[in-house]
Amino acid sequence: MPVLVVCLLIVLVSLIGGAVYGINKLIPTSKQMDLTEYYGQNADGEASLVAGTQKLEQKALISGDEVYIPLDVVNGYLNQRYYWDSANKKILYATPTSLTEEAASDQPGGNVWLKESTVYLKLDYVKKYTDIDSYIYKDPARIAIQYKFSNVQTVTVKKDTVIRYRGGIKSKILTKTAKDTVLRLMNEGEDWDQVATDDGYIGYIQKKKVSAADTTDYKRSFKAEAYSYFTMDEPVNLAWHQVTSTDANNYFADTTQNMTGVNVISPTWFSVSDNDGNVSSLASGEYVMQAHEKGLKVWGLVDNFSENMSTTTVLSNTAARQNLENQLVTYALKAGLDGINVDFESLSEDVGIHFLQFLRELSIQCHENNLVLSVDNPVPEDFTSHYDRAEQGKVVDYVIIMGYDEHYVGSDTGSVASLPWVEQGVKDT
């Protein structure tokens, strides 16, 4: 009999233990995630950074009530138009109508802080030209910045709940979230969705506690200065005219007498001649007058083909770059041109940001003087992404794709410009 009782007790204890274990598996943990562990350790004066739905390795700096964001974060996530002039230690910012500048200091207080070779921009300075929301917190110090407000995938919380570090009820809690809160949806799962809050938490929420995915356009009050464009009322049919000497201008009539369907001619008149940004010119006012009489617009072409200059050297040096811009506009106005066509080819990746700054600055001068600005580009490929045609399209009047050279001297035999290749180039632009 005692043996039977003992056995029954053992069975009972086992059943109770199993039940407790089973119940515990179903009870969500209420443990909170350590936020210092989550965001990472900061040195004195540093703050963790969240940009959109990403926790970043880079740190912000805090000085008193002011927050400073690393320039590479600003350029990479928020606004690429803050241009660092390293030689003169200042930030240039081109609006559609003016070029502004802010000198860097090795101390906080101003808009640009140069600390141990890293450039930081004051958050308020970034907000002056950029549509962002920022959330600043202590313990631990962190800054969350939201910058995407259109066509955002979202879910809405159906009742008060929590966001956890990982998917699963045993994962620690990151933060509470209230009914009707709109969360940014990162990934949909079977039972848990990965979401981000506007104030910088990135974690998981039970799928049954949020709505179906939706697309949200946030209402915004920020108004950026808009670019205006000089465009023609009809499609541009452009022909380049190779001019290698001033004497060649005298043959304009002969060259164009049988030309039909063209409304813009672009003579190859200008070339960057040295590393100071000086320009050699073959421009002719008489040529322009004859073209106008034939109903043609004239966009003078400038190239970077001279062996006596380095495109990187010219465009990365603000004095040389702006000398180039000034000379181009001066020559264009003197000859009575309607526009400038930039044909800078074989650009290396390291010159990409300087080329874009050149276009921004030249755009200001061209539009001040009623000149159309157009830019020639190779057909889009992965290795030419630094041309950044999307940014070009925002600051110039016409982005031109050179839809040829599919095959060339030294390549495999084939079409110069097959129709599918040209069509793909247009689609990819």
Where are the predicted features?
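Catalytic domains of carbohydrate-active enzymes, especially glycoside hydrolases
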Residues: A248-S273, Q327-I340
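Hydrophobic faces of well-ordered beta-strands that scaffold small-molecule active sites
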Residues: N237-H241, N263-P267, V298-V302, I340-V342, ...
